[in-house]
């Protein structure tokens, strides 16, 4: 950080950093709070009331048999019409990171429209994560603040990067990932300019000087602290699942590589669906309503047969920890595989959002299913399957470790690193590369 002209400006900058981090954390909490209450009303209270009114239809995973079709098709209609009427499209997380790293700022002229565009697919049950649209909104807000305070010093322009770090930290409750991703300019090492070969190559992360690291740490602490504090005081908020201790014995070590290969295959299915849905989207052309309603229909079908394929997956992961033994192994495995394919299809067909939370849940569901089949420790299986699925999709073990570091106990982390390296080290088949 260049030395500020006056000590007063330096102090003002540090205060602004802490406030920016706190505001980013508060914005993440508020978004999740609205989303959780909206989902609860739309997917719990209304179908329950309909089931009471029509007992003959009071069945299915949501208490009213045809309900997913009503809501998902309505959601597709609204999402498509909103895009058609406003022209608003949320950037994915890599696009946000690339703009912040390259320009040091993010556009803030349509933040209200972007917020609604990010929220709609989540409310209607989309198997997408909130991280993409929400991070763009927070980066825009931080750019707006930085532009108005830059007269106090050029360093205030860095508030966009600092706010983005704080937002990612609060989103994933993962300080390491929140610190590294904006510096890399990519959430998974596959930025806009990544080609077929570099997609699986090493990313370059220029670590800041010690003074900058302290400043970044203040922003990250402010964001995560505010997010956790609001969650404790008011409730709400999401975050990565936290798993208990893992037992790693001879049986688990025997299954390490096979489980990692299954997770890798699950990650490859993500790319199969991504390529197929991109081709379908291009074939349909500029018809956002048609594409979004087709995506809604696919979501409704999957959600009726496999309910856990819906939604981002962070809440469902906590539920699976307690209930996975009551679900057949085949259903858990199918859920993981189908969800990995459903997420990119929804994104390419207009239900825009992130893919991190859903892909993580795919690995969790897959791991629990394979734990039932193999008899191996469930947390071990979840750690290996989640890390390998994410490694296959992200192609960067460093990013996988940073994202999942706080999810697993020490023994699970070691296995997670090995699985991520295996999955990322196996080259993607050429037809699946961009």
Per-segment meaning from a language model:
Residues 1-434:
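Alpha-helical transmembrane segments and immediately membrane-proximal extracytoplasmic
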């Amino acid at each position: 950080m260049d030395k500020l002209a006056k000590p007063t400006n330096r102090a003002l900058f540090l205060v602004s950093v802490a406030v920016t981090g706190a505001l980013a954390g508060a914005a993440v909490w508020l978004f999740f709070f609205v989303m959780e209450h909206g989902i609860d009303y739309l997917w719990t209270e209304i179908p329950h009331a309909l089931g009471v009114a029509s007992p003959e239809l009071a069945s299915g995973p949501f208490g009213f048999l045809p309900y997913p079709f009503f809501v998902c098709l309505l959601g597709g209609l609204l999402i498509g019409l909103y895009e058609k009427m406003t022209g608003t499209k949320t950037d994915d997380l890599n696009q946000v990171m690339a703009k912040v790293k390259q320009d040091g700022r993010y556009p803030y002229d349509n933040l209200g429209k972007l917020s609604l565009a990010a929220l709609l697919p989540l409310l209607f049950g989309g198997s997408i994560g909130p991280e993409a649209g929400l991070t763009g909104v927070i980066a825009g807000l931080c750019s707006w603040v930085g532009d108005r305070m830059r007269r106090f010093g050029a360093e205030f322009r860095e508030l966009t990067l600092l706010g983005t770090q704080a937002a990612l930290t609060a989103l994933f409750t993962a300080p390491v990932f929140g610190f590294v991703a904006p510096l890399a300019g990519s959430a998974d090492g596959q930025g806009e300019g990544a080609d077929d070969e570099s997609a699986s190559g090493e990313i370059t992360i220029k670590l800041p000087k010690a003074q900058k690291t302290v400043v970044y740490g203040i922003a990250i602490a402010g964001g995560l602290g505010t997010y956790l504090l609001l969650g404790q005081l008011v409730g709400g908020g999401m975050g990565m699942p936290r798993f208990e201790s893992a037992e790693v014995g001879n049986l688990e070590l025997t299954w390490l590589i096979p489980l990692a290969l299954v997770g890798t295959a699950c990650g490859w299915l993500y790319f199969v669906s991504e390529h197929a849905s991109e081709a379908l989207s291009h074939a349909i052309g500029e018809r956002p309503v048609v594409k979004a309603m087709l995506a809604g229909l696919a979501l409704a079908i999957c959600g009726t047969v496999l309910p856990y394929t819906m939604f981002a997956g962070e809440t469902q992961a906590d539920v699976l920890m307690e209930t996975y033994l009551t679900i057949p192994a085949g259903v858990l495995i199918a859920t993981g595989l189908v969800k990995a394919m459903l997420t990119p299809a929804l994104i390419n067909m207009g239900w825009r959002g992130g893919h991190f939370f859903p892909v993580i849940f795919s690995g969790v569901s897959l791991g629990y299913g394979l734990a039932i089949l193999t008899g191996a420790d469930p947390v071990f299986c979840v750690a290996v399957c989640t890390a390998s699925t994410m490694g296959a999709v992200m192609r960067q073990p460093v990013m996988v470790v940073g994202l999942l570091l706080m999810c697993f106990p020490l023994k699970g982390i070691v296995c997670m690193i090995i699985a991520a390296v295996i999955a990322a080290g196996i080259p993607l088949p050429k037809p699946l590369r961009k």
